[in-house]
Regions:
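A structured beta-alpha segment of the ubiquitous adenosine-cofactor-binding alpha/beta core
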Residues: 2-4, 16, 62-119
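N-terminal Rossmann-like NAD(P) cofactor-binding subdomain of oxidoreductases
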Residues: 81, 100-156
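Structural scaffold positions in well-ordered secondary structure
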Residues: 15, 31, 72, 99, ...
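Glycine-rich phosphate-binding loop and adjoining beta1-alpha1-beta2 segment
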Residues: 33-74
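Acidic, glycine-rich segments within the central catalytic cores of soluble metabolic enzymes
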Residues: 7, 151-273
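A short, aliphatic-rich alpha-helical micro-motif
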Residues: 10, 89-93, 141
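Conserved small-residue-rich beta-alpha loop and adjacent elements
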Residues: 7-47
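Long amphipathic alpha-helix in the N-terminal Rossmann-like dinucleotide-binding domain
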Residues: 33-38, 123, 146, 211-213
Length: 273
C-alpha cells in the first residue's frame, strides 16, 4: 500500500488474517494502513460474521465491517475441508505474519495451530487474540468487548459514584486489544530482522484492559481499596479538578481577547494563563 505516494512502512510484509468481528480485524487493519499486504481468509458461506452485523441494506457489507477491514484483500476458503487447510498452509509459506482470534481450541482442531504452521514456515510470526490468557481459570471461555472490559476492571471504575458500573461509549476491549496486538507484532517483526526467527504472540482482552486501567490498580495498591467510580471527575485526589461545567459565552470578542491576553494568575505553586 502506498501512502502519499510513498511505500508504506510495512511494505513487503504479508499478513494472513484469520480474524473476525473487531478485536482481530482492528489489528490487521492497522497493519494494512502501515503498508502491509493483508490477506483476509473468510468462510465461503457468508464470510466474516461482521459483514452482516447491523447491515443497513440487504446484500451489502455492513458499515461495521467496512470500518475494520479497509485496505485488505479477501480470499474465501473452506477450513472444514482438507483442501482448505492445505491452502492456508501453502499461503503460510510466503507469509510473515499469521493472526487468528478463533474460540479456544478451534485452530488446533483444524490443524492450524502454531506448532503446525511452524513446520510450514519456521519464521512465521503467529499472533493469537483471545479473551483470557493461558493458565487463566477462564481460558476456555469466549469473550466479546463488554466481557473483556468487565473482566479487566474497566466497568468498575466507569460511571457515577452512586450509580451502577457503566460501559464506555467506545469498544475499548475490542479495538484496544487489537491496537496492542498490532504494536506487539511490530516488535516481533523488528526482532525478526535481528534473529531471523518467528514466535507465537498471545494477547488476552482481560490483560489488555488491565494494562489500560493501571492507574486504577495503582490507586488500590496505594490506598488499600479499589478505585471508586468518579463520573467525569478523577478518582485520584492528586489530580487537578476536572468535571463538566456550564459556562456563558463572552458577549463580545473583545472580552474573549482580553481573557486570552490576560495576566498570569498564580494558583498554589503553579500558574495559569
Amino acid at each position: 500500500m502506498n501512502v502519499n505516494g510513498k511505500a508504506g512502512m510495512l511494505d513487503g510484509v504479508r499478513v494472513l488474517d484469520m480474524t473476525q468481528f473487531e478485536a482481530g480485524p482492528s489489528c490487521t487493519e492497522t497493519l494494512a494502513w502501515l503498508g502491509a499486504e493483508v490477506v483476509k481468509i473468510e468462510n465461503p458461506k457468508g464470510g466474516d460474521a461482521g459483514r452482516f452485523a447491523n447491515t443497513e441494506k440487504p446484500g451489502i457489507d455492513s458499515f461495521y465491517f467496512m470500518q475494520f477491514n479497509s485496505g485488505k484483500k479477501s480470499l474465501t476458503c473452506n477450513l472444514k475441508t482438507d483442501e482448505g487447510v492445505a491452502l492456508v498452509k501453502k499461503l503460510v509459506k510466503e507469509a510473515n505474519v499469521f493472526i487468528e482470534n478463533f474460540a479456544p481450541g478451534v485452530v488446533k482442531r483444524m490443524g492450524l495451530d502454531y506448532e503446525a504452521l511452524k513446520k510450514e514456515n519456521p519464521n512465521i510470526i503467529y499472533a493469537s487474540v483471545k479473551g483470557f490468557a493461558e493458565g487463566s481459570p477462564y481460558e476456555d471461555f469466549l469473550s466479546f468487548d463488554m466481557i473483556g472490559q468487565s473482566a479487566g476492571g474497566v466497568l468498575s471504575i466507569t460511571g457515577e459514584p452512586d450509580g451502577k458500573p457503566c460501559k464506555p461509549g467506545v469498544t475499548l476491549a475490542d479495538t484496544g486489544t487489537g491496537m496492542l496486538m498490532a504494536i506487539t507484532i511490530l516488535g516481533a517483526l523488528y526482532r525478526q530482522q535481528a534473529t531471523g526467527e518467528g514466535e507465537h504472540l498471545q494477547l488476552a482482552m482481560q490483560d489488555a484492559m488491565t494494562q489500560y486501567s493501571r492507574l486504577a490498580y495503582a490507586y488500590r495498591d496505594l490506598n488499600g481499596k479499589a478505585a471508586p467510580r468518579a463520573g467525569p471527575r478523577s478518582f485520584s485526589p492528586a489530580m487537578p479538578p476536572m468535571e463538566f461545567f456550564y459556562v456563558n459565552r463572552a458577549e463580545k470578542m473583545t472580552m474573549y481577547s482580553s481573557l486570552l491576553h490576560g495576566q498570569v494568575i498564580v494558583i498554589g505553586n503553579g500558574f495559569a494563563i
